[in-house]
């Protein structure tokens, strides 16, 4: 009996790339297909669907400058990665290779193209990332989380399907928890997160914003905040002095459940975060990461802001006074919080993993009879 077709999932080594790949992998395995992950060494830190036995690490390099030395280093690493990926394709013979963005996806997708293996890229951002943009003209098909991402290019738009962002089972479970607005005198559960690049600004601004809230709000507040180890002491000192009910951690392994139990979220606006806020349906205050060439986080936050589901604050406007003002206004208006939660849910797509799996099967040309639905 021949083994089931293999789908190779290629993703950069951060959660924003890995989590959608994991969510798709779960659905493909439920359909009786085999999956493997191709990524860079950063992904080995994540626990999840992909064990080390299911993961192949391919050399790659992010473009970090335009100097001749930087470009030569990047080119050499991508060349070495592509050679290794070609060997991998020859050995594994995947039915299709699916990319989820990040420079580590370039070698496997280029190798698949050279070997005439069907390819697809998925992009979760409102503005397509640079690696996916480079690959988009060469792949068999494109999937996006949001509509209209490639409307300015008719050739790319013609092979693009809007699927949404695949969600892990933990997110789908959290999405089943309905939003319950805070009672006027009851607890106000505030979740503050920002990822490795965003937690520093949250540590700089949020404690001083909390200081400016009323004593009544201090008594109501149940605060959960992601804080880097190096910022922990100074943040804790402020909250201890205010006698708050708070919890600080550098990383929350149960973040989906934390999102589900929150009344309001303060966060960066990476594609994964925005998609999870939409799927679970929670109001948010979003602070896009500045300086990105494509301003992708600004555009991502704009999707929820346009749906009246989030308040978007540029980092130069993200001051303690501004944040305190927004928290105070929302805490006094549970009806607005409820409307924001509903607006977020209106953006979310809970069936995205199934929709993307359908597209993968189509691109790979896998007959329905070869699959076994579990």
From Swiss-Prot:
What pathway annotation does it carry?
Cell wall biogenesis; peptidoglycan biosynthesis
Membrane topology of this protein: Peripheral membrane protein
InterPro entries (UniProt xref): GlcNAc_MurG, Glyco_trans_28_C, GlycoTrans_28_N
Can you supply one Gene Ontology CC term for this chain's record?
Answer: plasma membrane
Arranged from A to Z, the UniProt key words for this protein are: Cell cycle, Cell division, Cell inner membrane, Cell membrane, Cell shape, Cell wall biogenesis/degradation, Glycosyltransferase, Membrane, Peptidoglycan synthesis, Transferase
Q: Where in the cell is it found?
A: Cell inner membrane
CDD domains with a match to the protein in the record: GT28_MurG
What are the GO MF terms of this UniProt record? UDP-N-acetyl-D-glucosamine:N-acetylmuramoyl-L-alanyl-D-glutamyl-meso-2,6-diaminopimelyl-D-alanyl-D-alanine-diphosphoundecaprenol 4-beta-N-acetylglucosaminlytransferase activity; undecaprenyldiphospho-muramoylpentapeptide beta-N-acetylglucosaminyltransferase activity
Record has Cell inner membrane as a keyword: yes
Q: What is its main location?
A: membrane
Q: Which GO terms describe its biological process?
A: carbohydrate metabolic process; cell division; cell wall organization; lipid glycosylation; peptidoglycan biosynthetic process; regulation of cell shape
Q: EC annotation?
A: 2.4.1.227
Which residues participate in UDP-N-acetyl-alpha-D-glucosamine binding?
14-16, 125, 168, 196, 297
Question: Looking at the keywords, is Membrane present?
Answer: yes
Which reaction is the catalytic activity of this chain? di-trans,octa-cis-undecaprenyl diphospho-N-acetyl-alpha-D-muramoyl-L-alanyl-D-glutamyl-meso-2,6-diaminopimeloyl-D-alanyl-D-alanine + UDP-N-acetyl-alpha-D-glucosamine = di-trans,octa-cis-undecaprenyl diphospho-[N-acetyl-alpha-D-glucosaminyl-(1->4)]-N-acetyl-alpha-D-muramoyl-L-alanyl-D-glutamyl-meso-2,6-diaminopimeloyl-D-alanyl-D-alanine + UDP + H(+)
Q: What NCBIfam families does the record point to?
A: murG (TIGR01133)
Q: What does this protein do?
A: Cell wall formation. Catalyzes the transfer of a GlcNAc subunit on undecaprenyl-pyrophosphoryl-MurNAc-pentapeptide (lipid intermediate I) to form undecaprenyl-pyrophosphoryl-MurNAc-(pentapeptide)GlcNAc (lipid intermediate II).
Could you say which protein family the record assigns here?
Answer: Belongs to the glycosyltransferase 28 family. MurG subfamily.
Can you name this protein?
UDP-N-acetylglucosamine--N-acetylmuramyl-(pentapeptide) pyrophosphoryl-undecaprenol N-acetylglucosamine transferase
Q: Which organism is it from?
A: Rhodopseudomonas palustris (strain BisA53)
What is this protein's gene name?
murG
